[in-house]
Amino acid sequence: MAEKTEKPTAKKLRDAAKKGQTFKARDIVALVVIATGALSAPALVDLTRVAAEFTRIASTGAQPNPGAYALAWAKLFLRIAAPFVLLCAAVGALPSLVQSRFTLAVESIRFDLTALDPVKGMKRLFSWRSVKDAVKALLYVGVFAITVRVFADLYHHDVFGLFRARPALLGHMWIVLTVRLVLLFLLCALPVLIVDAAVEYFLYHRELKMDKHEVKQEYKESEGNHEIKSKRREIHQELLSEEIKANVEQSDFIVANPTHIAIGIYVNPDIVPIPFVSVRETNARALAVIRHAEACGVPVVRNVALARSIYRNSPRRYSFVNQDDIDGVMRVLIWLKEVEAANRGGPPREMPPEATHAPDAHGGDAASGGATSAQAGERNA
């Protein structure tokens, strides 16, 4: 069996998330819920109403109806506890959704009998995650002992002074001391939580590691084999009409952006010396134009700034290039003629200083333009 040494791919992580296998730092979720509950308890949990109710019953000595009495206490409990519980539930759900990247694990909902396999249960019992949980539990015991000691040193006067407090304030003081104890525990446990999250992240990626064969197979499935790629090229070709294909073939070059815009440039000095926009396509049709141009030997110059400028300043096909873009177009034409002359073996004439840097200044792709310009010269000849 091949050793799994490769990191999980994005597709592997997405497929695992659909099965419920996501990175889950449960202690961080618990930390957020407990901290939110501790901070919101003094404002949301009002025990003075409970104390006032007990005081009223004790002072009047009335004998209420048991059913009505229980119903009144239930309503009071819901009014006090419902906002607190809803807030904690909402705060607890948010970190879980963020960790799962808002992915619904639909495949984990189905009934799976393999989860009852005792062999898998034994493997989980003696796994690295079980060792991590055991060590974490021991660390939490130590953290709790330290928390109690520090809390006793800081607040023992407040604890022993509770017997002198008024009954109406007793509940509020207990809540305040409990909140302080909880926050102190969370502060002491924070290093353990961080280490636990880091180890959990490492174990999660370790479980999803892939061997090289799996990576190659996944790449083949996602990118497709040669037959599928050929079919995709055929689909791109079908996006173009015969008129567009003819315009591409007659163009002097195609300037691309590099995949979202394709502009065809045609120049005929015998008719008019101004460059002419013969093709103007975007998105999938632009990709089809680029593929067809490469297949026909028409130079393709990948120049983001020039392509965007021509597309913006020349809003229609079969229009002249705007005067703001003529300089850039002519620089590309001069450069292509120099490359064509060099590929034919003839001595290229010396370019003027402002044209020698045309490919770099406009982002021209020398490899693409140079490789296809020779074919273009043979076609034009």
From Swiss-Prot:
According to the UniProt record, which cysteines are disulfide-bonded? none
From which residue to which does any coiled coil extend?
none
Transmembrane: present as a keyword of the record? yes
Name where it mostly resides: membrane
The UniProt entry, under InterPro entries, shows: BsaZ-like, T3SS_substrate_exporter, T3SS_substrate_exporter_C
In the record, biological process GO terms are: protein secretion
- TM region positions: 28-48, 80-100, 134-154, 175-195
Low complexity bias spans: 364-381
Kindly state one GO CC term assigned in the UniProt record.
plasma membrane
What domain of life?
Bacteria
Q: Which family does it belong to?
A: Belongs to the type III secretion exporter family.
What is the annotated role of this protein in its UniProt record?
Answer: Part of the bsa type III secretion system, is involved in the intracellular replication of invading bacteria inside the host cell. Probably necessary for the lysis of the vacuole membrane and escape into the host cell cytoplasm.
Cited PANTHER family: FLAGELLAR BIOSYNTHETIC PROTEIN FLHB, SURFACE PRESENTATION OF ANTIGENS PROTEIN SPAS
Q: What is this protein called?
A: Secretion apparatus protein BsaZ
Q: Which organism is it from?
A: Burkholderia thailandensis (strain ATCC 700388 / DSM 13276 / CCUG 48851 / CIP 106301 / E264)
